[in-house]
């Protein structure tokens, strides 16, 4: 049996409106700071992904990737402007020039020929998390279970490809556009598990005082990089 997939899964309108408000704030704050610097701007496209990129209590873009990107481009004579994007449209946006690069806990594995890369600058584990009291202990226990993943993300690719022999063919995969929703779905018991970067899951647990359990065996250990358009010849990589 092939994996089943629902291309969208929605929670209530309040959750989605809150996520949309955060997206709008991230874009406007990043643009103002870059303009005030007086340097030529580089538009960095990402979605909100604590602890890599998010808004602090003052509404200013911050996080691991924000700090690295800001300093790296400053040394090259540019000011990084952080713009929140629809993650599903990331390739079209960078190829069209709407953004200069994709930077936000972005896995290089399997995408080496799709973009012009700088990196890897960090290693990350893609993992499955379940409720703390779940009977799921390994990937093989996912048979007949429902897993939420971010649409166009690496975990979605792994589950839908059917290429990993550790993963049962009867897993139902729900693809979510906004990754914050997948965390909420697990916390509310709407799904049996989620798959994402381990650091992001740990940050969500810390920020929201929830108790997930991360399976010991990772889906993937991957390098994180900065993706430019394939034909970008500016030497920014």
Predicted feature residues:
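N-terminal secretory signal peptides and thylakoid transit peptides that target proteins
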Residues: 2-18
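C-terminal motif of bacterial Sec signal peptides marking the signal peptidase cleavage site
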Residues: 25-28
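Extended ligand-binding regions for polar small-molecule ligands
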Residues: 30, 63-75, 133-154, 225-237
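Bacterial lipoprotein signal-peptidase II cleavage site
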Residues: 30-36
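Extracytoplasmic small-molecule ligand-binding "clamshell" domains
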Residues: 36-105, 113, 175
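Periplasmic-binding protein-like
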Residues: 46-48, 123-130, 206-237
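Ligand-binding cleft/hinge of the Venus flytrap
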Residues: 54-58, 69-78, 154-176, 205-209
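A ligand-binding cleft/hinge motif common to bilobed small-molecule-binding domains
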Residues: 89-92, 105-114, 158-162, 185-220
């Amino acid at each position: 049996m092939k994996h089943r997939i629902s291309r969208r899964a929605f929670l209530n309108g309040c959750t989605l409106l809150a996520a949309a408000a955060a997206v709008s704030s991230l874009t406007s704050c990043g643009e103002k700071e870059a303009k005030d610097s007086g340097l030529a701007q580089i538009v960095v496209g990402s979605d909100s992904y604590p602890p890599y990129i998010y808004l602090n209590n003052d509404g200013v873009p911050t996080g691991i990737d924000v700090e690295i990107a800001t300093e790296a481009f400053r040394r090259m004579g540019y000011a990084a402007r952080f713009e929140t994007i629809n993650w599903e449209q990331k390739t079209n946006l960078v190829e069209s020039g709407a953004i200069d690069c994709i930077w936000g806990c972005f896995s290089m594995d399997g995408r080496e020929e799709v973009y012009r890369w700088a990196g890897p600058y960090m290693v990350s584990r893609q993992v499955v998390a379940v409720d703390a009291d779940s009977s799921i202990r390994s990937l093989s226990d996912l048979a007949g279970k429902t897993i939420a993943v971010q649409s166009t993300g690496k975990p979605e690719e792994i589950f839908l490809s059917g290429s990993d022999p550790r993963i049962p063919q009867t897993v139902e995969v729900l693809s979510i556009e906004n990754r914050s929703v997948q965390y909420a779905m697990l916390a509310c018991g709407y799904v049996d598990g989620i798959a994402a970067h381990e650091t992001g899951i740990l940050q969500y647990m810390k920020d929201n005082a929830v108790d997930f359990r991360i399976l010991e065996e990772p889906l993937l250990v991957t390098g994180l990089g900065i993706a430019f358009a394939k034909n970008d010849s500016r030497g920014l990589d």
